[in-house]
Amino acid sequence: MIDCHIRLQQGQFSLDQHFQSDHTVIGLFGASGSGKTTILHSIAGIITPQSGWIKVQNQTWFDHCQKINLSTQQRRVGLVFQDAQLFPHKNVMQNLLFGFKHIQPQQRQFEVDYIVELLKLGHLIDRMPIKLSGGEKQRVALGRALLYSPQLLLLDEPLSALDAAHKAEIIPFFQKVIQDIKIPMLYVSHDKAEIEQLTDVMWYL
């Protein structure tokens, strides 16, 4: 369950949004500049709202009145951005293991081999990011986020940088992850059809 009320002011930009849902995969839809990424950054702990609260799975991550503000590390969210943001000097396997190595063994929900097979990355594990297509990079970024065993997966326009062919290639992998892995997800996009295809419910900004 996600329950958040985020209020903040950044220069001329003002945000005051309240969302609550028990659905597993939530879509956040709105035009560019409507505050979608700001909401994700607030939930992740990258930005601190001026007031409000953020509760995920009955745990309070932020509450202005109660003076609660967990760090990004304490929240343990998985982030996937539109440009993948892989480490260019690390191969695919090293990228996949980055978050995995930074959590305790008892916190790990998935084996590396399971995620590699789920996302069909076996033939790519020794490649450097520069040798990957856009769709392959996003699969690696998704795998890296999942291996961090997040309490919440935040996907910020993960397909917007891909052409139609690469979108068609990667959407089945997202659908497979949604079907097989029951991690709450917040999926941001300005593409309404994409959100309708991949999420359980849509929030409008």
Task: Label every PLM stretch briefly.
Residues 61-78, 102:
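ABC ATPase NBD coupling module
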Residues 64, 107-124, 175-176:
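Conserved ABC ATPase "signature" region
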Residues 128-132, 136:
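Conserved ABC ATPase signature
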Residues 142:
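Hydrophobic anchor residue at the start of the ABC signature
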Residues 147-151:
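A short, proline-enriched helix->beta-strand linker immediately N-terminal to the Walker B motif
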Residues 153-157:
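Catalytic Walker B motif of ABC-type/P-loop ATPase nucleotide-binding domains
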Residues 182-188:
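Conserved H-loop
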